[in-house]
Amino acid sequence: MAAEHLLPGPPPSLADFRLEAGGKGTERGSGSSKPTGSSRGPRMAKFLSQDQINEYKECFSLYDKQQRGKIKATDLMVAMRCLGASPTPGEVQRHLQTHGIDGNGELDFSTFLTIMHMQIKQEDPKKEILLAMLMVDKEKKGYVMASDLRSKLTSLGEKLTHKEVDDLFREADIEPNGKVKYDEFIHKITLPGRDY
């Protein structure tokens, strides 16, 4: 698996996310919710499934207390976490700034969809792991020593405990002092879990 396949491409256009859960787009501007048709549906499908959109709309509606099609910026982090994202306060602030929304502002559903898409895309576990491994593998050999990877996983970003790293290595069949090949490691730890 080549590294370039895991790195994100250009971000989607905001127009790609102007889609309500029912499949109809809305016209943005001065609070208008005038339908624009479903011509954007196929473009949206390449980013989010209809099931995801419906799930996001349901969560968004829980925080849209006035039922005006908007949620408070202060509710954004909680709404994102309810949907399985793990944004930091700094990431939430950057998302809001990107869309010109201050901490006391509001955001509509299409903006929420865009933010969720960008957050989920940036949280791609394969990408995160690859970037961590590339930091360790300065000579670009295609592998890192398990001890070096352990050091990075326990000291950077969302730090793992030594027990969590042990569990991760055990799951991926990695010896504590062995070599860790990118492709094999990423493949093993990102396989979907089995339902028993």
From Swiss-Prot:
<feature type="domain" description="EF-hand 1">
    <location>
        <begin position="51"/>
        <end position="86"/>
    </location>
</feature>
<feature type="domain" description="EF-hand 2">
    <location>
        <begin position="87"/>
        <end position="122"/>
    </location>
</feature>
<comment type="similarity">
    <text>Belongs to the calmodulin family.</text>
</comment>
<comment type="subunit">
    <text>Interacts with MYO7B; the interaction mediates the association of CALML4 with the IMAC/intermicrovillar adhesion complex. Interacts with MYO7A.</text>
</comment>
<dbReference type="GO" id="GO:0032028">
    <property type="term" value="F:myosin head/neck binding"/>
</dbReference>
<protein>
    <recommendedName>
        <fullName>Calmodulin-like protein 4</fullName>
    </recommendedName>
</protein>
<dbReference type="GO" id="GO:1904970">
    <property type="term" value="P:brush border assembly"/>
</dbReference>
<keyword id="KW-0966">Cell projection</keyword>
<feature type="region of interest" description="Disordered">
    <location>
        <begin position="1"/>
        <end position="43"/>
    </location>
</feature>
<dbReference type="GO" id="GO:0030234">
    <property type="term" value="F:enzyme regulator activity"/>
</dbReference>
<comment type="function">
    <text>As part of the intermicrovillar adhesion complex/IMAC plays a role in epithelial brush border differentiation, controlling microvilli organization and length. Acts as a light chain for MYO7B and is required for efficient targeting of the IMAC to the tips of border brush microvilli.</text>
</comment>
<feature type="domain" description="EF-hand 3">
    <location>
        <begin position="124"/>
        <end position="159"/>
    </location>
</feature>
<dbReference type="GO" id="GO:0000226">
    <property type="term" value="P:microtubule cytoskeleton organization"/>
</dbReference>
<dbReference type="InterPro" id="IPR002048">
    <property type="entry name" value="EF_hand_dom"/>
</dbReference>
<dbReference type="GO" id="GO:0005509">
    <property type="term" value="F:calcium ion binding"/>
</dbReference>
<dbReference type="InterPro" id="IPR011992">
    <property type="entry name" value="EF-hand-dom_pair"/>
</dbReference>
<dbReference type="GO" id="GO:0005737">
    <property type="term" value="C:cytoplasm"/>
</dbReference>
<feature type="domain" description="EF-hand 4">
    <location>
        <begin position="160"/>
        <end position="195"/>
    </location>
</feature>
<keyword id="KW-0677">Repeat</keyword>
<dbReference type="GO" id="GO:0005902">
    <property type="term" value="C:microvillus"/>
</dbReference>
<dbReference type="InterPro" id="IPR050230">
    <property type="entry name" value="CALM/Myosin/TropC-like"/>
</dbReference>
<feature type="compositionally biased region" description="Basic and acidic residues">
    <location>
        <begin position="17"/>
        <end position="27"/>
    </location>
</feature>
<feature type="compositionally biased region" description="Polar residues">
    <location>
        <begin position="29"/>
        <end position="39"/>
    </location>
</feature>
<dbReference type="Pfam" id="PF13499">
    <property type="entry name" value="EF-hand_7"/>
</dbReference>
